[in-house]
């Protein structure tokens, strides 16, 4: 359990998420993320030189990604701060926040910034020399697509793990479609009153199109509404499977930033000094081969145990749900109402840019609890390699 790590209320942002090959498809994720963070600091009147350490969460290689931590720190104005690159697939956000929290807990630094930035669009195509190959043919990898399609240990694609979990927990096509419609309904809640909820945390992203033209993206792009009839008409992705392209997420682009600091500094930086946000605990798990979604529940239970909490103590639950079966399986194991989780949106609906996904979900959970007057937030999500991570925050 952590006791010394705090997040200032509104000391965070998420850009809109754009479906891949959209408006952010050609932007360098680290450069765009750092520049967006710098604009956010300016909007808050924060001095980036006060940041002592930068944690960059990113999973898709970009040019000179090797320098991500210190490079991003310098670009955002924190020129005296070192930085580290964290890549833990889709649980990168949870690990980044936890690592920042551990830095506070151990007294290594007093003020940190977590930048989560990724671009699934136009992923890199890597090649390695192979002199012993036929005619010297290189070893090649499409960074994004090849890793969607094959876990080198479990031996299957991501969608296969979802079907394995669905079969293990006796989940049906009808349940997956029904939950997708519920998640769509919850996302629509965030769009009411001219996106009133999203405007609590969403920060526009600006793209330099030319010397004279700047494109501003203010809202999510590429979210397709679902209907019962539309979902029912879709074929399963795998023969006899329960998931269609409607009941799984899609790759996206975007970035998020979160301040993790001391209680005193969090109060100074907070939009409401009376609304305290504490990083409380962390959990992790690994499921058996090819059962990625099954790791979510035990990781959540570990975070609860570390915090000394029960499910009934939670005020909000947010999950990274790349497949509808994720939430259904988690609900079965932990005795949850799947329909009550993920108010105001989730990655099943607004897309998955990988590293930033969890951060946006955490931010949305904070804002939901702020509206309710406070409570405990659980974020849980699966990650490549049949793993999962969870984090608990106390709001108020």
Regions found by a protein language model. Give the residues of each.
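Conserved beta-strand-centric core segments of catalytic alpha/beta enzyme folds
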Residues: 1-39, 95-139, 146-160, 167, ...
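Claisen-condensing/thiolase-fold acyl-transfer catalytic domains that form or cleave C-C bonds
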Residues: 2, 61, 65, 71, ...
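Short amphipathic
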Residues: 7-13, 203-206, 276-285
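N-terminal extracellular/periplasmic Venus flytrap/periplasmic-binding protein-like
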Residues: 14-15, 26, 30-35, 43, ...
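Conserved beta-ketoacyl condensing-enzyme motif
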Residues: 25-98, 103-132, 200-217, 311-334
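Flexible, glycine/charged-enriched surface loops at secondary-structure junctions
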Residues: 47-50, 173-177, 189-204, 272-277, ...
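A short structural micro-motif
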Residues: 57-58, 182-186, 285
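Short, well-ordered beta-strand elements within core beta-sheets of diverse protein domains
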Residues: 162-172, 301-309
